[in-house]
């Protein structure tokens, strides 16, 4: 439950065990065997912690230029509906801009549209 111990951390490089625990709780299945190759190539990744426990995560992949992509936004079900995902995405947006991303993209399932609109995302047409 959110309280004064929830901390949003930029580029925390969580352990594979911490990521696997969160991945299983949030997605219902195992994640990649190792997250290191993913995280070391990210423009930024952001974690939410309750003390030492990783309870939320978002990753931003990029093309090495001006386009970046929000991926894997998740929060442990015991901590959902407290604004943690909004804080994760907001930090990811802020750091992505500071690191040179001019375009930040996200693909999502239809039931997440309201959430991503609340984060400031909207549809764009390819030119």
What are the language-model segments listed below?
Residues 66, 102, 122:
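Short acidic/polar active-site loop segments enriched in Thr and Asp
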Residues 1-33, 127:
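Short amphipathic alpha-helix that is part of the acyltransferase structural core
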Residues 76, 109:
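Residue-level recognition of the GNAT/N-acetyltransferase active site
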Residues 34-74:
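A conserved beta-strand-loop-helix scaffold within acyl/acetyltransferase catalytic domains
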Residues 96-108:
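Conserved GNAT acetyl-CoA-binding A-motif
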Residues 117-127:
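Conserved acetyl-CoA-binding loop of GNAT-fold acetyltransferases
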Residues 81-94:
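Conserved acetyl-CoA-binding loop-helix of GNAT-fold acetyltransferases
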């Amino acid at each position: 439950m959110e309280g004064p111990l929830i901390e949003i951390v930029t580029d925390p490089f969580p352990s594979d065990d911490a990521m696997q625990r969160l991945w299983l709780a949030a997605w219902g299945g195992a994640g990649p065997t190792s997250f290191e190759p993913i995280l070391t190539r990210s423009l930024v990744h952001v974690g939410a912690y309750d003390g030492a426990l990783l309870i939320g995560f978002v990753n931003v992949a990029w093309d090495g230029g001006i386009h970046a992509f929000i991926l894997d936004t998740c929060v442990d079900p015991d901590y959902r509906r407290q604004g943690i995902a909004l804080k994760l995405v907001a930090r990811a947006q802020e750091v992505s801009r500071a690191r040179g991303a001019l375009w930040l993209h996200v693909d999502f399932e239809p039931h997440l549209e309201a959430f991503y609109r609340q984060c400031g995302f909207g549809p764009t047409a390819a030119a």
